[in-house]
């Protein structure tokens, strides 16, 4: 046969044994660590001559905290273009390194992906009170650290936290809102001149319009070291008839704050007068609850009575004693003076 020709088709396959995976990640800078928002990983497999290697099994090397969107399989077969894809998610915020490997078992260059906390589920997880029982002197400070996390306990940065206090006599700085830092904490400080137990309420908004709140207690106490004991009587003299009374008021305050403590009185009666000759009610010893006590005095024995009040604060500070003097006038003398008017 003259001029006979025959065509033969020859197929060259890529060298799968030299297949090298090159890893790429979608262009998203970060995803939310909610177990749903996924990065797409694409591994392209080529042999040493740059030919795509379809059908090669690609292994995506995922670190702890990162997993496939569906199932647990990290092995994906490359398509006709030598590409394998895997979507991955996380519930733990952080930056992770991922590699892929194929036929030659050599890992690709590492790519990083970042998952961030989920603002949609922002929650006030705690309020730390530092410096509790500070003095209510307008200078001593307390610090409040409000921690915000998401539904998966990831610390939330850049969340606006509102803090209020009741009663409202607490001076907060900043007054209203603070933004959480890298540790998920919004930090406030406070001073006051009003000793009280304050209820702190922290609030953070979620994307669905809901809010998360949490409360804590903080106590400012009176400065009992600088407390002042005072005593007075509604009268300076009375008739020694056993009926008329004098009412004495005794106070223990630091600035405008009541101070707790024990109080007792020493009574100096006229010569010859025993305790049976007068009444001091209800008792000579007591304790301050709200910074104030009252006592009544009456007598049937004339003369000058001196009452010396002493106090010891619950903090262990002894106060400077104060005195009240009352003159009891003989009943007959009082009647004569009244008749002469």
Language-model regions, residue ranges each:
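The feature marks long extracellular or luminal low-complexity segments
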Residues: 1-341
């Amino acid at each position: 046969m003259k001029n006979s020709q025959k065509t033969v088709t020859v197929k060259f396959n890529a060298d799968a044994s030299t297949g090298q995976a090159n890893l790429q990640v979608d262009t998203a800078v970060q995803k939310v660590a909610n177990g749903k928002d996924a990065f797409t990983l694409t591994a392209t497999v080529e042999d040493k001559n740059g030919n795509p290697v379809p059908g090669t099994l690609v292994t995506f090397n995922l670190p702890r905290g990162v997993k496939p969107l569906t199932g647990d399989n990290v092995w994906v077969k490359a398509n006709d273009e030598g590409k394998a894809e895997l979507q991955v998610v996380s519930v733990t915020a952080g930056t992770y390194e991922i590699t892929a490997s194929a036929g030659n078992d050599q890992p690709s260059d590492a790519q990083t992906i970042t998952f961030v906390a989920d603002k949609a589920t922002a929650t006030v997880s705690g309020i730390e009170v530092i410096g509790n029982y500070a003095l209510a002197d307008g200078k001593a400070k307390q610090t409040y650290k409000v921690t915000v996390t998401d539904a998966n306990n990831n610390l939330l940065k850049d969340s606006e936290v509102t803090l209020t206090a009741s009663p409202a006599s607490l001076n907060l700085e900043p007054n209203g809102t603070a933004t959480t830092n890298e540790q998920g904490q919004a930090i406030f400080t406070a001073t006051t001149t009003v000793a009280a137990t304050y209820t702190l309420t922290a609030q953070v908004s979620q994307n669905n319009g809901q809010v998360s709140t949490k409360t804590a207690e903080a106590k400012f106490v009176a400065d009992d070291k600088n407390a002042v004991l005072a005593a007075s009587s509604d009268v300076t003299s009375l008739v020694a008839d056993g009926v008329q009374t004098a009412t004495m008021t005794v106070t223990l305050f630091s600035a405008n704050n009541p101070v707790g403590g024990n109080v007792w009185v020493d009574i100096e009666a006229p010569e010859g007068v025993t305790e049976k000759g007068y009444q001091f009610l209800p008792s000579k010893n007591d304790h301050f609850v709200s910074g104030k006590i009252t006592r009544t005095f009456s007598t049937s024995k004339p003369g000058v009575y001196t009452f010396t009040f002493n106090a010891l604060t619950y903090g262990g500070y002894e106060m400077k004693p104060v005195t009240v003097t009352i003159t009891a006038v003989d009943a007959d003398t009082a009647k004569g003076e009244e008749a002469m008017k």
